[in-house]
A protein has these predicted regions:
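Regular secondary-structure segments
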Residues: 5-16
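Glycine-rich, charge-dense phosphate/pyrophosphate-binding loop(s)
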Residues: 15-119
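Conserved mixed alpha/beta catalytic, RNA-binding, or beta-rich assembly cores of soluble enzyme
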Residues: 1-3
Length: 119
């Protein structure tokens, strides 16, 4: 029920109002809850990869929000307020990531749905 409340009362309004702080906070909290459910299968950690977990914590400390991991990982993700903030995160963490065998990429959302047409 708590995840449902986060989605309905925080995540969706955050998207609708372009409020990255609200959206990101909801994503992070949902990810913490879900990661906690899998911690026993992941050596006691909410992260499937300790390296991704360390990098995610560093991104959070540097101002990123909406931090989590894909399904069982090891892909981690975070949101930044703008391109400049994303590049600051990238340049601050890329060498640390490489040392842990990780790759950091900057990606943008595609703000339009898919189109289906005749072949």
């Amino acid at each position: 029920a708590h995840i449902c409340r986060l989605v309905l009362m925080k995540l969706i309004p955050g998207v609708k109002e372009a409020d990255l702080a609200a959206f990101g906070s909801a994503i992070s909290e949902i990810q913490e809850i879900v990661g906690g459910h899998f911690a026993n299968e992941q050596g006691g950690s909410p992260w499937s990869s300790s390296a991704v977990g360390r990098l995610a914590n560093r991104m959070r400390d540097m101002g990123a929000t909406g931090i989590g991991q894909s399904s069982w990982g090891p892909t981690g993700f975070a949101f930044a307020a703008n391109q400049q903030a994303a590049e600051r995160l990238y340049h601050s963490l890329v060498e640390e990531a490489k040392a842990d065998g990780l790759e950091i990429i900057i990606a943008q959302g595609r703000n339009a749905g898919a189109r289906i047409g005749p072949a």
